Amino acid sequence: MTPISVILVTDNKLTRPKTMSTTREKLLRTTSRFVSTFGSFDIEEILSIRTPTCLYHQCCPSFNKNVVTNEETRANFPQFIATFKRFDFSIIEPDHTLVDEAARRVMIRAKASAESIVGAYENEYIFILKMTDDCRFIEEIYEFYDTIRLKDLQYRLEAKHISYGDAAPFKTRDTQL
């Protein structure tokens, strides 16, 4: 079994290796593209780094999330851009990014800072990205996030009588609770 390549920088005494493997560089480059497209408001750009069969696992049981396909992402996207005026997305503590070269996986901790039609929205995430063998595309995305913060946004939308509908990224209180 190939060991997982992990670089954790906890103080100034530890530094990155002077040379990174080509696989590691490719994985991190694709991860960087994922992060930069996340808040782009361009569905073609967002999907361009995914394989046609990419599966997006939203791993928050309290929202009854299932696996989302590219087609479902495309169908739900108009509701996303109607809800958010701005969506900034970035990696928290990049030095804590985990890279498993053999499995072609990268784990990042990220944050969103956004302006929605009902005010500010912030959240934190953990993403695990499974890449293709050539490391250029994402085959699977596993997303974990703070459900309390998302529920707060949901309740604020409902208070303004803004319906997201069943196909939206989350359901209204009437259909969820």
Swiss-Prot record:
Q: What happens when the gene is disrupted?
A: Strongly decreases the production of austinol and dehydroaustinol.
InterPro entries recorded for this chain? Answer: Fungal_Meroterpenoid_Isomerase, NTF2-like_dom_sf
Q: Which Gene3D superfamilies match?
A: 3.10.450.50
Q: Which GO terms describe its biological process?
A: terpenoid biosynthetic process
Protein family according to the UniProt entry:
Belongs to the trt14 isomerase family.
Could you give the subunit structure recorded for this chain?
Homodimer.
Q: What else is known?
A: In A.calidoustus, the austinoid gene cluster lies on a contiguous DNA region, while clusters from E.nidulans and P.brasilianum are split in their respective genomes. Genetic rearrangements provoked variability among the clusters and E.nidulans produces the least number of austionoid derivatives with the end products austinol and dehydroaustinol, while P.brasilianum can produce until acetoxydehydroaustin, and A.calidoustus produces the highest number of identified derivatives.
Protein name, UniProt field = Austinoid biosynthesis clusters protein F
